From Swiss-Prot:
Source organism superkingdom: Bacteria
GO molecular function terms noted in the UniProt entry: histidinol-phosphatase activity; imidazoleglycerol-phosphate dehydratase activity; metal ion binding
Organism: Xanthomonas campestris pv. campestris (strain B100)
Gene3D superfamilies referenced in this protein's UniProt entry, alphabetically: HAD superfamily/HAD-like, Imidazole glycerol phosphate dehydratase, domain 1
Keyword terms, alphabetized: Amino-acid biosynthesis, Cytoplasm, Histidine biosynthesis, Hydrolase, Lyase, Magnesium, Metal-binding, Multifunctional enzyme
Similarity comment text for this entry: In the N-terminal section; belongs to the histidinol-phosphatase family. In the C-terminal section; belongs to the imidazoleglycerol-phosphate dehydratase family.
Region feature (Imidazoleglycerol-phosphate dehydratase): 169-375
Gene Ontology cellular-component annotations: cytoplasm
Name of this chain's protein: Histidine biosynthesis bifunctional protein HisB
Name of the gene encoding the protein in the UniProt record: hisB
Pathway(s) where this gene product acts: Amino-acid biosynthesis; L-histidine biosynthesis; L-histidine from 5-phospho-alpha-D-ribose 1-diphosphate: step 6/9; Amino-acid biosynthesis; L-histidine biosynthesis; L-histidine from 5-phospho-alpha-D-ribose 1-diphosphate: step 8/9
Length: 375
């Protein structure tokens, strides 16, 4: 899914003269900060579409040739800096015509509204006039009004690029079935004490490890049919958490993607081939997690438990919880644990996953960590 940044031209990409017509080369001036901001947005995965009202373009008072020269030069300068527009959409009507193709109308948007590859949740409109904001509202996307002397506005290009490209990675997932009601809220870019309430105190304690050692804000609330058993509550919590991770990560641009142990980790156990992920000790126990946000869910568990349950959590549901997270998040996870104390082994698994997550979700730039072009 590709986000689109729809942009006005005059007053947004290039400054608008007093007569509101850029019909000569000497009138061509770029808005401050537009090129570095658009480069940042390009690197964040955005495509660009110009949507502009040009009153009476092609008429005697505004000949097409007078428009084409400065416009083509503008496009060439943008292209020379690595900024290419997917399309340039121009409405030539007069305001009195009330044409559906004239902003804030969305008549020119029909092909885009039919395009299922567009990520509308991240798409936005940038312009200098209130009609640009109304246009955004008609498309049900976010609108940014640039700050200008003529029309007001609250934004500059640097702020817009930061808001869209560096937006906090948050998600709120509500999963309701006849068996459970689960709510998961997380913010991958904010550190906060985790809050969990599932009706299963030991399970709550384990979920807290994910937020605490993963380094992100996590709030999980669950109501389930515990009068039957713990299965539905634990399983559905895993599914909701996995979905929240998937939504918060978005297209995964800029993340580390992988969580694993460095080759020279002091915690590696000689001769034990299971220790190949992020390896964590807990007294006599050692747990290892290696993961990949590949979009292809796969789970491998290597370990066993002697007790039927630890606290109120059946040990058979420990790997089942992690499998549920993988299925809903598109995560490939290898989890290995060795030890004697089952409490330590279960907790070690949760902590190892959390530390591997911390590494994988860390932002390391703006590139997509895949040669396929999508994750």
């Amino acid at each position: 899914m590709t986000p689109i940044l729809f942009v006005d031209r005059d007053g947004t990409l290039i400054t608008e003269p007093a007569d509101f017509q850029i019909d000569a080369y000497e009138k061509l001036r770029f808005v401050e900060g537009v090129i570095p901001a658009m480069l940042k947005l390009r690197d964040a995965g955005y495509q660009f579409v110009i949507v502009s009202n040009q009153d009476g373009l092609g008429s005697e008072s505004y000949p097409q040739a007078s428009f084409d020269g400065p416009n083509n030069l503008m496009l060439q300068i943008f292209a020379s800096q690595g900024i290419v527009f997917r399309e340039v959409l121009i409405d030539c009507s007069w305001p009195a015509d009330n044409a559906p193709t004239r902003k804030p109308g969305v008549g020119l948007m029909v092909p885009y509204l039919q395009d299922r590859t567009i990520d509308w949740s991240r798409s936005a409109m940038v312009g200098d006039r209130i009609t640009d904001i109304q246009f955004a509202q008609n498309l049900n996307i976010r609108g940014f009004q640039l700050r200008t002397e003529q029309f007001g506005g609250d934004w500059d290009w640097a702020g817009i690029a930061h808001e869209l490209a560096d937006a906090p990675r948050r998600a709120v997932v509500q999963r309701n079935t006849k068996e459970t009601r689960i709510r998961v809220e997380l913010d991958l870019d904010r550190v906060a004490e985790p809050h969990t309430a599932t009706g299963l105190p030991f399970f709550d304690h384990m979920l807290e490890q994910i937020g605490k050692h993963g380094g992100f804000a996590l709030d999980i609330r669950a109501e389930g049919d515990l009068h039957i058993d713990e299965h539905h509550t634990i399983e559905d919590t895993g599914l909701a958490l996995g979905q929240a991770l998937r939504e918060a990560l978005g297209d995964k641009r800029g993340i580390g993607r992988y969580g694993f142990d460095p080759v020279d980790s002091p915690w590696r156990v000689a001769g034990d081939t299971a220790q190949h992920g992020f390896t964590l000790p807990m007294d006599e126990t050692i747990a290892s997690a290696a993961l990949d946000f590949s979009g292809r869910p796969y789970f491998v568990f290597d370990g066993d438990f002697k007790r039927e349950r630890v606290g109120d959590m059946p040990t058979e549901l420990v790997p089942h919880f992690f499998r549920s997270v993988c299925d809903a998040s598109g995560l490939n996870l290898h989890l290995h644990v060795r030890g004697e104390n089952d409490h330590h082994k279960v907790e070690g698994c949760f902590k190892a996953l959390a530390r591997a997550l911390r590494q994988a979700i860390r932002r390391e730039g703006t590139a997509l960590p895949s040669t396929k072009g999508a994750l």
